[in-house]
């Protein structure tokens, strides 16, 4: 028979792992809802407030508010991803919950953006041709399809913090980061970002507010990709440097090496 203190310890460990797993699943569910809302927010379908809806304020103030919201997301999203922040942050939370908490934080900032975004309804372009309109709508959904596929080509559930808690639950030792470049990653180094760029720009009805979102988001993606690549070079070394030389970041290189 197990001593009471050992039984209590096992129950405590079991409860902690279960709580961590449930927490990561809740964060993942919130991410799914946020991602779906982002799609509706940009497309103007199925959401109570989209990128072009709302009472509106003077355009200079709207530009300022929207720029602050994008900057806030950029600061949170890139700041919490840096190694120095992670080292500090993991003094307060378990390593297995770090990624799920990062995902939750990003979703909360995005939710704030949805609520506070100020529309600028001035039309930039309006495609009335059925063919042109259909093409842009198809590109919009293609972009989101690329985003989803790109996450599964690497490790979807690890990217969003579920695998870490599931490994802890199953008592699996976390795998060391290893370089891999499946399918789309042989064409460009960041297909996930390519998908976002397509989705952000592909619309038959571009307003000034949507254009501002696309421009600021594109700027952040370029900056964020640069910061991410610095971390990847630090962790993977020459392997990733070789990959950088062979494969374009967002656009395929003309004489790109195949079969990596």
UniProtKB/Swiss-Prot annotation:
Places the protein is found: Membrane
Catalyzed reactions: methanethiol + S-adenosyl-L-methionine = dimethyl sulfide + S-adenosyl-L-homocysteine + H(+)
Keywords on record: Membrane, Methyltransferase, S-adenosyl-L-methionine, Transferase, Transmembrane, Transmembrane helix
GO biological process, one term: methylation
Gene3D superfamilies (alphabetical): 1.20.120.1630
GO MF, any single term: methyltransferase activity
Enzyme class label: transferase
InterPro entries with a match to the protein in the record: MddA, Nurim-like
GO cellular component labels: membrane
EC number: 2.1.1.334
Membrane topology of this protein: Multi-pass membrane protein
Cysteine disulfide partners in this protein: none
TM annotation in the entry: 27-47, 55-75, 107-127, 134-154, 196-216
Record family assignment: Belongs to the nurim family.
Protein name, as recorded: Methanethiol S-methyltransferase
């Amino acid at each position: 028979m197990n001593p009471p203190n050992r039984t209590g310890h096992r129950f405590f460990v079991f409860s902690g792992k279960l709580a961590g797993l449930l927490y990561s699943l809740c964060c993942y569910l919130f991410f799914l809802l946020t991602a779906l809302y982002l799609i509706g927010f940009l497309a103007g379908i199925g959401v109570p407030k989209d990128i072009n809806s709302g009472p509106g304020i003077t355009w200079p103030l709207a530009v300022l508010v929207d720029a602050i919201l994008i900057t806030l997301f950029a600061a949170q999203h890139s700041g919490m991803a840096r190694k120095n922040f992670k080292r500090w942050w993991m003094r307060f939370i378990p390593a297995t919950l770090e990624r799920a908490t990062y995902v939750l934080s990003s979703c909360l900032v995005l939710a704030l953006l949805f609520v506070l975004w100020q529309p600028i309804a001035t039309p930039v372009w309006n495609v009335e041709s059925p063919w042109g309109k259909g093409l842009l709508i198809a590109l919009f959904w293609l972009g989101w399809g690329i985003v989803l596929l790109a996450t599964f080509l690497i490790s979807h559930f690890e990217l969003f913090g579920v695998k870490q808690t599931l490994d802890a639950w199953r008592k699996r030792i976390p795998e060391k980061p290893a370089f891999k470049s499946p399918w789309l990653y042989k064409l460009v180094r960041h297909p996930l970002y390519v998908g976002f760029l397509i989705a952000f720009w592909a619309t038959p009805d571009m307003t000034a507010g949507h254009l501002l979102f696309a421009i600021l988001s594109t700027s952040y993606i370029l900056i964020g990709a640069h910061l991410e690549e610095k971390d990847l070079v630090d962790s993977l070394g020459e392997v990733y440097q070789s990959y950088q030389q062979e494969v374009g970041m967002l656009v395929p290189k003309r004489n790109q090496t195949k079969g990596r």
